[in-house]
Amino acid sequence: YKEDIVTIHYESTFQVQRALDYLVPYGCKRFLAINPATPIGQIEEVLDYIDGVNLLMVNPGFAGQKIVPSTLRKAEKLQKFLQEMHREDIILEVDGNITKEHGATLRSFGASIFVAGTSSIFCTDVSHFGEKIREFRKAVE
C-alpha cells in the first residue's frame, strides 16, 4: 500500500525530521504543512527531508474561514525563500479559502497544488460540480 503524498503538520510534533524520516520506506512524497503564523525560516532545517510545503491560508480546524490576509504575502516570501535556498524543486501547495481569485494570485507565487473546497468548488447542486472544477482550473492555469 502506497500513498502519493503524506503531509506532516510542522506544529504537530517536536520531532519533525524524525516524522518525515519515518515515511521514507513508503516511497511517498513528504509534505510539511505550516500554519499561517509559523515563520517560514522554521522549515529551513528540514528542507532536505521534504518534497513539498502545504501553506495553510487559514487557521486549521474550521471550514469556511476567510483567508488570513498576510498569507498571500507569505506565499510570495516562501517562493523567494525556496529560490534563495536553491530549492525550487519543492512543491508549493496551498489550503484554505482558495477562491478562483486567490488561486490565480497564489499560482503567480509558485503554487501548483490547490486544496479546493467550500470557497471554490463545493456546491449544493452536484450537477454543477464539474463546471465548478473547470472554472477553477481555468482560473489557476
List each model region and its residues.
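Conserved anion-binding
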Residues: 1-91
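Short Gly/Pro-enriched loop/turn and capping motifs at secondary-structure junctions
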Residues: 60-61, 97-101, 120-121
